[in-house]
């Protein structure tokens, strides 16, 4: 049976703990799993959403406004709306983080649409991916 809360996008996994419907749009919370040597997503900023990253295991590298932060288990990083950022795992083990975004404008529907656009035969249509990002308030940098 398929886990409705798990969304696979390329090599990364999103497992929703609270989605936009459960919180009436107040927030979303999910586990974000990134395999070694993976970079996701493209540099962007959120027009209307703040993000908090809490390291669960491994080390997530997040570049925020040009400065690299290494987020290990138990460490936290706040990403205010409007700040350009990207996530990657530059290390040899899988990284897992708890992500909370408020308000819950970038939720399950966004990630399901991204999965449909990314998980295709051949190369994804980058312009289509950017259009989905913009629709949900993520602005490619």
Q: What residue spans do the PLM features occupy?
A:
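Short acidic-glycine-tyrosine-enriched beta hairpin
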Residues: 66-82
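A short glycine-rich, His/Asp/Glu-containing loop-to-beta-strand
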Residues: 7-43, 49-50
């Amino acid at each position: 049976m398929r886990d409705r809360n798990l969304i696979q996008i390329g090599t990364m996994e999103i497992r929703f703990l609270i989605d936009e419907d459960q919180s009436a749009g107040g927030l979303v919370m999910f586990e974000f799993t990134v395999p070694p040597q993976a970079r996701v997503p493209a540099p962007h900023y959120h027009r209307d959403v703040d993000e908090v990253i809490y390291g669960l295991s491994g080390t997530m590298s997040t570049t925020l406004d040009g400065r690299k932060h290494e987020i290990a288990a138990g460490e936290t990083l706040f990403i205010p709306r409007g700040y350009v950022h990207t996530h990657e795992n530059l290390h040899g083990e899988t990284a897992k983080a708890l992500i909370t975004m408020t308000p819950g404008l970038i939720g399950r529907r966004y990630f399901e649409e991204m999965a449909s656009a990314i998980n295709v035969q051949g190369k994804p249509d980058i312009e289509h991916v950017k259009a989905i990002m913009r629709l949900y308030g993520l602005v490619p940098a």
